């Protein structure tokens, strides 16, 4: 059996999803506080910095209980992929997406007002 992996989503496709009639996904940003100070995603997100997983780990099942698809975001798409893999190991029924290229791709392809760092 193949291991579960998050589905890749490009920045422009995520933008379309957030603007169309489909229910919005739950956005989870795994970047650190200092990174959020540099560049914020222009939508509501859950902030789960990986370095402080002890602060949010226990609440994950509650926060994901509504069954919405989850899109995980980081700077370049690597840390978010790792969290996405972990989420699918814990809750294989979830629909998990990874923003390819992270917020950097969002800045390059969707919204240049989001600073690059």
Enumerate the predicted regions with their spans.
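Short, surface-exposed ligand- or partner-binding patches at beta-edge/loop junctions that are enriched
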Residues: 73
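Rhodanese-like catalytic fold shared by cysteine-dependent sulfurtransferases
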Residues: 1-25, 33-69, 78-117
């Amino acid at each position: 059996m193949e291991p579960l992996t998050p589905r890749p989503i490009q920045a422009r496709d995520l933008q379309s999803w957030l603007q169309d009639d489909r229910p919005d996904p739950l956005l989870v940003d795994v970047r650190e506080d200092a990174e959020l100070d540099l560049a914020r995603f222009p939508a509501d997100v859950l902030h789960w910095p990986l370095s402080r997983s002890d602060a949010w780990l226990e609440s994950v099942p509650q926060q994901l209980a509504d069954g919405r698809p989850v899109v995980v975001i980081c700077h370049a798409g690597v840390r978010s992929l790792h969290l996405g893999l972990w989420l699918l190991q814990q809750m294989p029924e979830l629909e998990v997406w990874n923003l390819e290229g992270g917020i950097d791709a969002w800045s390059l392809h969707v919204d240049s007002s989001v600073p690059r760092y």
